[in-house]
Design a protein with these regions (language model features):
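Positively charged, low-complexity terminal tracts
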Residues: 1-86
């Protein structure tokens, strides 16, 4: 089983700071789930591609505990920058 959950193509209008800074790399990301591994355990699949280089990025195959850790880290980072978190 493979199923796409969400994706976000980079939009330079949403973040012109990243778009205009040659030292920053704009990326697109996608989240999916898959269970076609040798152990048949479902994993969260995070793909990050540099703009203009589709298929050349990194793909993380995360067990549920790893995905929860990233979720907690994102929540904490949002809190640190003053964003409301659920």
């Amino acid at each position: 089983m493979r199923r796409s959950i969400d994706d976000h193509p980079f939009d330079p209008l949403q973040d012109p700071v990243v778009a205009d800074d040659p030292d920053l790399t704009p990326v697109s990301w996608a989240i999916a789930i898959a269970d076609d591994y040798d152990d048949a355990e479902p994993r969260v699949v995070l793909t990050v591609d540099e703009i203009g280089k589709p298929g050349e990025g990194l793909v993380a195959h995360l067990l549920p505990a790893e995905a929860r850790r990233i979720r907690a880290a994102l929540r904490d980072a949002l809190r640190e920058v003053g964003e409301a978190v659920e």
